[in-house]
Regions:
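Acidic helix N-cap motif at the loop->helix transition within catalytic regions
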Residues: 14-18, 42-51
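Hydrophobic helical membrane-anchoring modules
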Residues: 1-3, 176-241
Length: 241
């Protein structure tokens, strides 16, 4: 296997696009998918086990007894994959596949000795399809600007759930637990930037506008997090500065 995709799942039994996963797994022979069941209380475990049974060479399932939140669920999956696979590229996608598996795999070609971190961007252009509700877009741009200022980096979209890392960058970025369950993406940027230094980090990173991204309803982020998110960002900025 060359690449490993971590897919965190919390009560996703009714949202997982089974046909899309089946279509991908029946054709791709060089990518492993590791589903992390983050303490789900619905039938997520059963749905994931069906994938494991159908594609035993390409699917692994890690069941967590306690809900850790997206960031640390992804980290647990990454740590498992680092210890049990020889993959050279690691990353994650959301279970609803707002970004397709095929597009994630296409981005693996950009990971080289010189480029160790590739992240998708929901930047709408004339030649791509980015479907987001207007309100979410406006709020998202406000948050993205604040995050860019905190990082002191010209990053358009830190929060897109499509990211890829070289094996070395993976080990650096996921070495310790995250402060925030939802702003852990910001911590990834801080960790790599602090390790490499700003200039080298920028040289090793690549932000790629996605060809297709579709917002899916029933977000796991509660609206009340909009109030506590700023405190999380403050804690992250203080911890990594």
């Amino acid at each position: 296997m060359n690449a490993c995709i971590i897919v965190p799942c919390y009560n996703e039994a009714k949202r997982i696009p089974t046909p899309a996963f089946n279509s991908f797994l029946s054709k791709d022979s060089d990518t492993q998918i590791l589903f992390v069941n983050d303490g789900s209380t619905d039938d997520t475990a059963e749905v994931l086990q069906k994938f494991r049974t159908l594609y035993p060479k390409h699917v692994e399932v890690l069941n967590l007894e306690k809900n850790l939140g997206k960031g640390n669920a992804v980290r647990m999956g990454i740590q498992n994959a680092l210890h049990h696979t020889d993959c050279t590229v690691f990353g994650f996608l959301d279970a609803d596949l707002s970004t397709s598996l095929e597009e994630w795999v296409a981005l693996t070609q950009l990971i080289t000795d010189k480029t160790e971190f590739v992240f998708g961007s929901r930047f709408k252009k004339i030649d791509n399809s980015i479907e987001r509700k207007w309100f979410r877009f406006v709020v998202g741009r406000f948050i993205a600007t604040a995050i860019s200022k905190a990082l002191n980096l010209a990053v358009y979209d830190t929060q897109c759930g499509c990211k890829l890392f070289s094996r070395n960058a993976t080990q650096l970025a996921f070495a310790s637990p995250f402060i925030s369950p939802w702003l852990f993406d910001v911590e990834l940027f801080f960790r790599l930037k602090n390790h490499y230094g700003t200039a080298t980090f920028k040289a090793k990173s690549m932000e790629i506008p996605l060809k297709n991204w579709t917002h899916q309803e029933d977000s796991k982020i509660k609206w009340t997090y909009g109030f506590t998110m700023w405190f999380d960002l403050f804690k992250i900025k203080r911890a990594y500065s």
